[in-house]
């Protein structure tokens, strides 16, 4: 049987090779095949299609052409491109000869490049485009490209195509325990806990077809080609890509289980007997992301291995394995040719009411169609799942004796069309909302007749259309999940309100607020449903008739496990993160001021690299940083504190820019002056000058910056196009834009904050203090004019002072906002309904006499400190140098994106690490341009009084507009600021040099 199967496969391969045709377009046509479009023009094409809604969806594209798939296979070598550009200029790419075992010439394309290939097509029909590529080192994120055909975007899904990387855990050694189970040799700390493994990239040559990055299309993306020469353009979005060749072909479709099983039976396949292969899920061979590594689950004794005391690496997946396209792969051996069953021990207690889906492949291909979308329903406990049909009959898998792989990939499955339809509905609902508020405003008078029906004659038709689409989505959802779920409740609420508004459109004035809430809830429904988490404990590949034992945990066993956990919680100090150093070893104590996720990651990095490299042990404790100063003064503080926020506990809070912790501790002799270390000057070259300003005073440096954030401008591309507005470059442009927005009942979003005031102050040439920081400089003409300008936006232009701008940006009420750049990460995760409709740019600036635009902004961030009570200052300094280094900050950024996704992206102050984070190339360009203008806000004794009084003056002016004068209010407050500065300088016996103007 085995020989016959291998012979059949060999014949198929020879036939496939025989049909292959290496295509070389005639030289005379190659130059003509190039499109001539620049990368910027391609980017504009994507934007125009996306924001105008003109881009065709793949299903519509496929339905509009004859469903014919030619058997021909066309291949173009990577080196045979017809055009290459880099950074918008003609260039020559780098070449790789016989790279990593692949014979021939490969071409390296950068993330800021475009490359074009020409195909000579003889027969019309649909073709699948695939690439043989190698994921060369980059920023450790998925490779992204836009794909164009003959200079056009055939359909929306090709605007962003991802090519994945391959990862593996850095622990590969294993052993067989006393129970005969193969386990990995994880590192352990002194408490017996397994250390979290790291992930390293394991690149290899990959042939990949094109898939929808959002997962709404679950099949391969195809191109319809007519006879003649066609040009395929690959436009870089993120990460470099090494291309060996491109291929146009059509693979044999995957048959259903019964058809495949009949073919196996006809070939003589038989059941194997007596074999059980057990695979611990945490022993994964490869994954698609550094987010996927062994996890520790102590919730139940059902997992293996289990312990109520130690934290053991015993599962994989969970919340980190939820995003479309993520996959995990395992290797296994079977001793005999024949049929096997496959079972999993899994838990899906994350998504209630619907199932999560996986595409299951063996040796790189799905054996039959049912595994292209296999569902795992909700279960609160660990369970045994045998891969079976809908009637519960276990599938049989034919396997040759020897080594195999099994891969499970997140897909949206049967929910994909529903989610896509609801996404379209949300887009329409938001458009309707913007149309209505142009007539009524965001807070309409219920007793006024706005004549909505007359002013918006197309509204009824729009409401009816979106209602029908939403009703269809609800019906399809119920067909999938039945009536035993509440997942449709949000959609039904939205549909019912649409029924009410179709009947009487004037009701918008009464229900506009609830309509907005319901639209937001519908958008959030998308975020919830596209999350597809699943946790695995182990897998079995076993002969039919063999028994696999998965212990069922009863009530008493579960109760005893919880009692043991409770007992150990009184014995083990859970404020200690990971390894607790031995009493007689050299160690420093580290306090961390953020969350447990961060603390666990930091501790694992310390154990993996810092302690082995330096011999310095680190006791890590997770504490509330509000206690740091008191604990230090009481002699109970740490040696080192990292991720220290502002002394009011809110780094980056709305009311504060800068971080005053370092200087406040420094003037009280609570922290070490880092300039005493001989290599301090070399270390601070890692940071921008602006990040250091807030940490020093009178030549001393009391800390190192960890994070640095600053404002950026966010704008809705679709709405600006709709209104005919350009992205504002100056504040004069902003005022013009605000006029247009006001006419359409929209606003410019900018909450009052020190970041906004500092931005205006610095752009106008002002300063907070004189040169030595002993006097306020807010009484200068520049500062007074800046304060006037600051107040005018909230008095003359009536900007909102309270409502959060991020949700109003999402609904379109505020299509242009100024916000901290970290909002980018939140929008990427929480606002899929406006994906592709927004972008970022440097903040508006002030035009100078020479015509240049000053875009200065202030910044804030977290700080690292060495406490003066330490007995190990040199060891502490070694730790800070390690912690703020390029590689460590880069790895920390990757690790934090592992459990939290893009929302966990770290705004590191290390400039090299910042540029290695997985930003799109265009967004990174915008951030780096703004970075050029970032300034630090100096911190001085008594400096907390500056913003407090500026803020008080602001609210006096903006609430008492008839009588309060910006100049007088600010001048009065400057007197109070100077009094506090003088008081603090006297308190700490500081001497002013009397120098002016900084």
For the regions a language model picked out, list residue spans one by one.
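Hinge/lid segment of periplasmic solute-binding proteins
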Residues: 567-584, 649-712, 735, 837-844, ...
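Extracytoplasmic/periplasmic solute-binding protein
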Residues: 693, 697-706, 711, 732-785, ...
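Long, aromatic- and glycine/proline-rich binding clefts that accommodate carbohydrate-like moieties
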Residues: 843-845, 894-956, 986-998
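Extracytoplasmic "Venus flytrap"/periplasmic binding protein-like
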Residues: 608-687, 718, 722-726, 815-816, ...
């Amino acid at each position: 049987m085995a020989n016959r199967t291998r012979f059949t496969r060999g014949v198929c391969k020879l036939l496939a090779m025989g049909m292959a045709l290496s295509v070389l377009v005639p030289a005379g046509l190659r130059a003509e095949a190039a499109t001539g479009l620049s990368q910027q023009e391609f980017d504009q094409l994507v934007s125009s299609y996306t924001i105008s809604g003109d881009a065709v969806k793949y299903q519509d594209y496929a339905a509009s052409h004859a469903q014919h798939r030619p058997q021909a296979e066309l291949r173009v070598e990577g080196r045979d491109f017809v055009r290459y550009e880099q950074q918008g200029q003609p260039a020559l790419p780098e070449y790789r000869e016989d790279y990593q075992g692949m014979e021939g010439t490969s071409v390296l394309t950068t993330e800021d490049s475009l490359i074009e290939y020409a195909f000579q097509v003889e027969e019309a029909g649909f073709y699948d485009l695939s690439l043989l590529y190698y994921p060369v080192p980059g920023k450790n994120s998925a490779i992204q490209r836009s794909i164009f055909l003959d200079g056009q975007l055939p359909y929306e899904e090709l605007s962003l195509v991802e090519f994945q990387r391959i990862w593996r855990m850095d622990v590969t050694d294993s052993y067989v325990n006393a129970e005969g189970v193969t386990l990995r040799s994880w590192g352990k700390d002194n408490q017996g806990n397994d250390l979290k493994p790291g992930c390293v990239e394991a690149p290899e040559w990959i042939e990949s077809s094109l898939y929808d990055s959002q997962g709404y299309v679950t099949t391969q993306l195809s191109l319809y080609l007519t006879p003649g020469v066609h040009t395929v353009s690959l436009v870089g979005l993120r990460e470099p890509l090494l291309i060996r060749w491109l291929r146009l072909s059509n693979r044999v479709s995957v048959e259903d289980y019964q058809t495949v099983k009949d073919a196996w039976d006809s070939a003589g396949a038989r059941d194997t007997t007596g074999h059980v292969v057990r695979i611990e899920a945490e022993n994964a061979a490869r994954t698609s992301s550094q987010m996927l590594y062994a996890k520790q689950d102590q919730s139940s004794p059902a997992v293996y291995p289990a312990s109520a005391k130690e934290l053991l690496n015993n599962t994989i997946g969970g919340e980190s394995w939820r995003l479309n396209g993520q996959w995990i792969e395992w290797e296994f051996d079977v001793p005999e040719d024949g049929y096997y069953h496959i079972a999993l021990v899994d838990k899906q207690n994350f998504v209630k009411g619907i199932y999560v889906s996986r595409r299951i492949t063996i040796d790189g291909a799905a054996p039959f169609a049912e595994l292209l979308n296999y569902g795992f329903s909700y279960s609160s406990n660990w369970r045994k799942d045998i891969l079976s049909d809908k009637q519960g009959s276990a599938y049989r898998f034919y396997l040759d004796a020897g080594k195999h792989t099994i891969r499970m990939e997140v897909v949206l499955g049967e929910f994909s069309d529903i989610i896509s339809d609801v996404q379209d509905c949300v887009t329409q609902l938001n458009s309707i909302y913007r149309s209505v508020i142009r007539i009524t405003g965001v807070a309409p008078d219920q007793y006024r007749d706005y004549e909505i029906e007359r002013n918006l004659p197309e509204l009824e038709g729009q409401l009816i259309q979106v209602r029908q689409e939403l009703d269809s989505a609800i019906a399809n959802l119920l067909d999938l999940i039945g009536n035993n779920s509440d997942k449709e409740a949000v959609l039904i609420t939205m549909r019912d309100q649409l029924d009410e508004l179709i009947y009487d459109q004037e009701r918008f004035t009464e229900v506009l607020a609830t309509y907005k809430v319901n639209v937001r809830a519908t958008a959030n429904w998308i975020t919830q449903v596209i999350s597809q988490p699943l946790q695995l404990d182990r897998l079995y590949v076993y002969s039919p008739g063999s028994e696999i034992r998965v212990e069922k945990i009863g009530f008493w066993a579960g109760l005893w496990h919880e009692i043991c956990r409770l007992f150990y919680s009184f014995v083990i100090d859970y404020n200690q993160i990971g390894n607790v150093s031995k009493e007689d070893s050299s160690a420093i104590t580290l306090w961390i001021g953020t969350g447990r996720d961060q603390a666990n990651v930091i501790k694992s990095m310390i154990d993996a690299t810092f302690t082995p490299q330096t011999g310095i042990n680190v006791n890590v404790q997770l504490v509330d940083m509000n206690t740091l100063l008191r604990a230090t003064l009481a002699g109970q503080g740490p040696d080192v504190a990292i991720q220290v926020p502002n002394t009011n506990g809110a780094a980056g809070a709305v009311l504060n820019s800068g971080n005053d912790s370092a200087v406040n501790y420094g003037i009280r002799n609570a922290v070490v002056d880092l300039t005493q270390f001989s290599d301090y000057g070399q270390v601070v070259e890692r940071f921008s000058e602006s990040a250091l300003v807030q940490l020093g005073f009178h030549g001393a440096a009391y800390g190192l910056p960890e994070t640095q954030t600053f404002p950026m401008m966010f704008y809705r591309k679709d709405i600006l196009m709709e209104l005919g507005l350009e992205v504002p470059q100056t504040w004069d442009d902003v005022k013009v834009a605000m006029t247009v927005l006001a006419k359409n009942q929209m606003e410019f979003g900018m909450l009052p904050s020190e970041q906004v005031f500092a931005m205006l102050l610095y752009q106008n040439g002002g300063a907070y203090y004189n040169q030595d920081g002993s006097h306020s400089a807010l009484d200068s003409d520049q500062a007074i004019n800046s304060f006037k300008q600051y107040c005018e936006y909230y008095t003359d232009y009536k900007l909102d002072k309270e409502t959060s701008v991020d949700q109003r940006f999402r609904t379109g009420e505020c299509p242009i906002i100024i916000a901290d750049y970290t909002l980018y990460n939140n929008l990427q995760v929480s606002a899929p309904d406006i994906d592709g409709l927004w972008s970022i740019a440097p903040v508006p600036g002030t035009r100078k006499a020479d015509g240049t635009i000053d875009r200065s902004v202030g910044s804030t961030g977290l700080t690292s400190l060495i406490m003066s009570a330490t007995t190990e200052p040199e060891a502490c300094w070694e730790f800070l140098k390690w912690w703020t280094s390029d590689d460590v900050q880069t790895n920390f950024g990757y690790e934090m994106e592992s459990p939290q996704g893009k929302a966990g992206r770290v705004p590191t102050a290390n400039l090299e690490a910042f540029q290695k984070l997985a930003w799109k190339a265009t967004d990174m360009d915008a951030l780096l341009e703004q970075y050029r203008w970032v300034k630090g806000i100096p911190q001085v004794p008594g400096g907390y009084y500056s913003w407090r009084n500026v803020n008080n003056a602001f609210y006096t002016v903006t609430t008492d507009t008839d009588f309060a004068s910006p100049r007088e209010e600010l001048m009065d407050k400057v007197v109070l600021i100077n009094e506090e500065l003088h008081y603090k300088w006297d308190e700490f016996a500081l001497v002013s040099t009397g120098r002016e103007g900084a």
